[in-house]
Amino acid sequence: MYDITKWKHMFKLDPAKSISDENLEALCMSNTDAIIIGGTDDVTEDNVIHLMSRVRRYPLPLVLEVSNVESVMPGFDFYFIPTVMNSKDTKYHNEILLEALKKYGHVINFDEVFFEGYVVLNANSKVAKITKAYTQLGIEDVEAYAQMAEELYRFPIMYVEYSGTYGDVDKVKAIANMLQHTQLFYGGGITNIDKANEMSNIADTIVVGDIIYNDIKKALKTVKIKESNK
């Protein structure tokens, strides 16, 4: 069994986006700790299973981040279930989880399932608009969400999502300082090794996504943070 708490770097692949076999191999053989498959929209059973079968050729952990019940399937090492804590829509708190449990609860291995407490902080992102996330949060707000995630909900993971833009370092630091047991994931705007280094010194784990599709060489360089975080 893989130990998620030791992961420092992950690549996130969107099943709705195309990626060449060459680039996929480069990602999977790059020494990243894991591949996450997940997206905000146009995530279907067909495109998830297609991408999963391609990644499965390589010997590294594979995670499905569940965004709808229809795309859930066996074959992943772990399943991450996001709950958007700053969403105004209860669908993104627990309704998707409820539907998943009704359909698959009798066959789920709960050792493979991890709840993620998401805080979405880029107001202009697609995920913020779809989830109706309230993003105008100050330091005290994000500290309270961190406390909520760790002390009350006892989430194993808190995910700070800036989705497409680089985050406010002070806010991410404030969240990190509140967490002792909950693992902090950071995703958003990591487009080069300098940003990867900066965020990897704050968060436990960084998630690199969009840059994969814009500049694969820059994406691959972000894995170098593991050398300085040994």
Swiss-Prot record:
One of its GO terms (molecular function) is heptaprenylglyceryl phosphate synthase activity. It comes from the Bacteria. InterPro entries: GGGP/HepGP_synthase_I, GGGP/HepGP_synthase_sf, GGGP_HepGP_synthase. Its cofactor is Mg(2+). Its EC number is 2.5.1.n9. Coiled coil: none annotated. It is an enzyme of class 2 (transferase). Keywords: Lipid biosynthesis, Lipid metabolism, Magnesium, Metal-binding, Phospholipid biosynthesis, Phospholipid metabolism, Transferase. Prenyltransferase that catalyzes in vivo the transfer of the heptaprenyl moiety of heptaprenyl pyrophosphate (HepPP; 35 carbon atoms) to the C3 hydroxyl of sn-glycerol-1-phosphate (G1P), producing heptaprenylglyceryl phosphate (HepGP). This reaction is an ether-bond-formation step in the biosynthesis of archaea-type G1P-based membrane lipids found in Bacillales. PANTHER family: HEPTAPRENYLGLYCERYL PHOSPHATE SYNTHASE, PTHR40029. Belongs to the GGGP/HepGP synthase family. Group I subfamily. Homodimer. This is Heptaprenylglyceryl phosphate synthase.
